[in-house]
Regions:
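Short glycine-rich His-centered loop
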Residues: 53-78
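Short helix-initiation/N-cap motifs at beta->coil->alpha
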Residues: 80, 95-106, 187-198, 202, ...
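A conserved helix-loop-strand patch within extracytoplasmic ligand-binding domains
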Residues: 92, 100, 133-183, 187, ...
Length: 286
């Protein structure tokens, strides 16, 4: 049985979102002009090189340590830093907009965002978007409370599992295509991925499934006493998604930029700002 739960956020489908997009771009230009104008040491050439960069609007949602807001309300995280550096090298400036994750495909197809970047797996979605090559790899895993009798994936039979809606874990538990994953009693599909943790902690669910990195981050931030099962659901490649009708070639150019960043060590250096073992995300692990 599947249950879906929703929360109210900015209505991204409305004309207000398009106004927001225009306002963000204009605001970015104004802020750059003001900031650069206060720096007397910069030349006119340097000022122009910054203010003239076209804006790439990146759609994402809150998912530490990949994308979240810092103490000042500014977007930060692995994906934010990677996007800013990669697009800078390509001659653009990246600007993140928090979206309803379930609306991501509609938003990018309508051009209200330029791409989707937020710990997003291409596995099984290859035909839905134009994808970059994977820039990182992540294990999708199951976590349970420390005192749980669930030790293996097989022990999930007849249990209740919390997942975020429209994610790979939701697909795996509902599709019944992987013989390793048993039928569970209930799948709680939550629009806000942060809610999967209280669902497990409060006992509404017997297990949760998500990216291992995100689970470990949440365990650290909130002192959660969870145990991650040894056997992963799967290992996925994380990519950046563009609309299939996008003809700018940004997906291919971004893939080449990722290769450059991998080769010069900047990819590992950026991930290392947030994780103690960045190399684990740079290679496929069983």
């Amino acid at each position: 049985m599947k249950h879906k739960f929703f929360e109210r956020r900015l209505p991204c489908r409305s004309p207000l979102f398009r106004v927001l997009r225009a306002g963000l771009v204009l605001g970015a230009v104004c802020c750059l002009v003001l900031a650069l104008g206060s720096c007397g040491g910069q030349t006119e050439t340097e000022t122009a090189s910054h203010s003239d960069l076209p804006v790439i609007l990146v759609g994402s949602d809150n998912y530490p340590p990949f994308h979240y807001e810092d103490a000042n309300g500014q977007p930060t995280g692995i994906d934010v830093d990677l996007a800013k550096e990669a697009f800078r090298r390509m001659g653009y400036q990246a600007m993140f907009v928090t979206i309803d994750w379930e609306d991501k495909k509609d938003l990018v197809e309508r051009g209200e965002i330029d791409c989707i970047w937020g710990s997003f797996s291409s596995d099984g979605r290859e035909d839905q978007y134009l994808w970059t090559e994977p820039y990182l790899y992540s294990r999708q895993v199951v976590a349970v409370r420390q005192d749980s009798d669930i030790q293996t994936l097989a022990d999930l039979a007849g249990k209740r599992v919390a997942v975020q809606s429209t994610t790979k874990p939701e697909e795996l538990f509902l599709a019944h295509t992987d013989p390793r994953i048993p039928r569970v009693a209930e799948v709680f599909s939550l629009q806000d991925r942060e809610l999967i943790y209280p669902y497990l902690s409060k006992g509404y669910a017997d297990a949760l499934a998500a990216h291992e990195t995100a689970i470990l981050q949440c365990m650290s931030d909130y002192s959660l006493d969870y145990r991650i099962l040894d056997e992963p659901l799967l290992t996925v490649g994380l990519g950046v998604a563009f609309a299939r009708t996008d003809q700018r070639g940004l997906d291919k150019e971004l893939s080449r930029t990722f290769e450059e960043m991998r080769a010069d060590g900047s990819l590992e250096q950026i991930v290392g700002r947030y994780l103690d073992e960045p190399q684990r995300l740079l290679e496929v692990t069983p």
